[in-house]
Regions:
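Polar helix-capping/helix-linker motif
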Residues: 24, 128-129, 158-159
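Short, intrinsically disordered, charge-balanced linker/junction segments flanking boundaries
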Residues: 243-246
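Beta-sheet entry/capping signal
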Residues: 33, 89, 142, 173-176, ...
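Bacterial Sec-dependent N-terminal signal peptides
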Residues: 1-45
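Class I SAM-dependent methyltransferase SAM-binding "motif I" and its flanking Rossmann-like core
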Residues: 154-241
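Short glycine-rich loop/turn motifs that provide flexible caps or phosphate-binding loops at active sites
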Residues: 37, 68, 145-146, 177-181
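Extended, subdomain-level signal for the structured scaffold at the beginning of enzyme domains
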Residues: 44-151
Length: 246
C-alpha cells in the first residue's frame, strides 16, 4: 500500500513550498509481550508495557527526526531510527492505546535494541510524574504514536514530558520519530486540532475558522523542523487544501 506524506517549509513571512514523499508501507504484527503497571512515589499511577531488558543502558546515539504519514509503519524508517540508537532503549509515547509497537520494534525489524517500553500519558498530572520524565530522558530512541494530537498538546505541553522530549532532541541528540498525530506535533509550527479536526473545504472557505488552530514555536523544538508544519493521512481524507491554509 502506498501512502503520501507532505511536509511544508515556511520561510516566514513570504515563501512557502512543499515536498512530497511517497513511502511503501508494510503492515507490522502486534503482539502483547509484557504488561507493567507503575506507581511512583507521589502515588500517581500510570500504565506502561515493556519488552526486553529491565536494566537501562547508555549507548552512543546520532540525532535525527523520522516523520511518518500515519499509514502502516515503514520498516526501513524505523530501522533507520534504531541504527542511530546504538542498541539502546526505545520509548514509545501515546495518550491512549496498547503496546502494539513493542514486539514489532523489539524483535521483528532485525535491529537489536535493549528494550522497548510503551507509556500511556493521558493527563497533565501523569505528564508531571518524575519517573516518566526520567524514562524518556534515559531513552536512546523515542517514537510518538498516532492518536489525537489535541491530547498530546493538552496533556504534555509545558510539562516535564515536553522538557524531556526536547532534551532528547537537542541535548542528548537521539533519534525521535512520530506517526500521524505524533508527526503532527514535531514541527516548529503545528496543527493542534484543539477545536476538532478541520477539513480542507472548511479551512479553504475560512482560514480564520475556529478549527484552524496553529501552534507556533511553543512546544517541541527540533532544529531540523524550524519553520516547518507537517500534515498526514494526505489521501484519506484529502488534506492538501487544509495544509495550504495552515
Amino acid at each position: 500500500m502506498f501512502f503520501n506524506c507532505y511536509f511544508i517549509k515556511i520561510n516566514y513571512p513570504k515563501t512557502i513550498y512543499y515536498e512530497k514523499k511517497i513511502f511503501c508501507f508494510k503492515k507490522p504484527s502486534a503482539f502483547r509481550f509484557r504488561f507493567v503497571f507503575w506507581t511512583d512515589s507521589s502515588a500517581q499511577t500510570y500504565t506502561s508495557w515493556k519488552v526486553g531488558s529491565t536494566t537501562d543502558v547508555t549507548t552512543t546515539t546520532t540525532g535525527g527526526i523520522c516523520l511518518m504519514g500515519g499509514g502502516t509503519d515503514n520498516d526501513d524508517a524505523i530501522k533507520w531510527m534504531f541504527q542511530k540508537a546504538g542498541g539502546g532503549d526505545v520509548v514509545v509515547l501515546r495518550s491512549a492505546g496498547t503496546d502494539g509497537y513493542n514486539t514489532y520494534m523489539y524483535s521483528e525489524l532485525g535491529v537489536p535494541v535493549n528494550s522497548v517500553e510503551t507509556i500511556i500519558i493521558d493527563t497533565r498530572a501523569k505528564a508531571s510524574i518524575a519517573a516518566i520524565a526520567t524514562k524518556i530522558r534515559n531513552a536512546e530512541a523515542l517514537f510518538i504514536a498516532g492518536g489525537d494530537q489535541a491530547t498530546y498538546v493538552s496533556y504534555w505541553k509545558d510539562t516535564p514530558v515536553e522538557d524531556a522530549i526536547n532534551y532528547l532532541i537537542n541535548t542528548k541528540k537521539v533519534p525521535v520519530g512520530g506517526t500521524s498525530a505524533g508527526c503532527a506535533i514535531l514541527g516548529q509550527y503545528y496543527y493542534s486540532a484543539a477545536n476538532s479536526s478541520v477539513t480542507s473545504a472548511q479551512a479553504l472557505a475560512n482560514p480564520y475558522a475556529s478549527g484552524v488552530t496553529i501552534g507556533v514555536n511553543d512546544f517541541l523544538s527540533s532544529p531540523y523542523l524550524a519553520n516547518v508544519i507537517t500534515d498526514t493521512h494526505y489521501d484519506n481524507p484529502d488534506r492538501r487544501g487544509r495544509q495550504t491554509t495552515f
